[in-house]
Amino acid sequence: DYPIRSVELNALEHGSGDFYTKNGWYDTNNVVFKESWMQFARSLAQGHVVVSDLYSNTQVMTGDVLSGLGSSAAILYYNDTVTYRDGTQEPMDLHVLPMPKTAGADALMAQAGVGLCAYKTTDQKAEAAALFVRWLTESERNLDFVAQTGYMPVRNGAFDAIENYDKFPEPTESYRQLYAALKIMQESYTPLSEPRF
């Protein structure tokens, strides 16, 4: 779904406007969206893009592809070695970069992640759920949580605090690169929630 969301963001960065029909399907009459889709389709047909039921990090770790597009939390699933199909291995030299963007346009980024909800319940349970959310998003606790999981911080000050964070898991440098990339995106990209139908 990350490549498809990138197609959508590319179309929006080019000024497509709404590209969904009232039934939630893509509007194939939207010229800007169609061109973004065809750019992706041509790259796919030429073998420049791999679409698979595997996560992109799996294909990076087996040496099948040189790069992948995925969520920030995918950092949890990278090994420190690349293991090729023939069993040979070499050290992983992971580099984490900001999400690709359209040249000359305002950068957009997908905003997705863990959703917390509380079902209609008793007042006491609702208060307990609210207390848990406040506890989890308290600045220092949230900083520790996101630094261990690859999630984007929910507190603005956490981006500044994470620059000097010293408890990242291994590979430490990859986590530092991840949060440097996320900080760039937080400062210069506009987040968009995924569409709801």
Task: Give short role names for the model-derived ranges.
Residues 41, 45-46, 84-152:
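Extracytoplasmic/periplasmic substrate-recognition and gating elements
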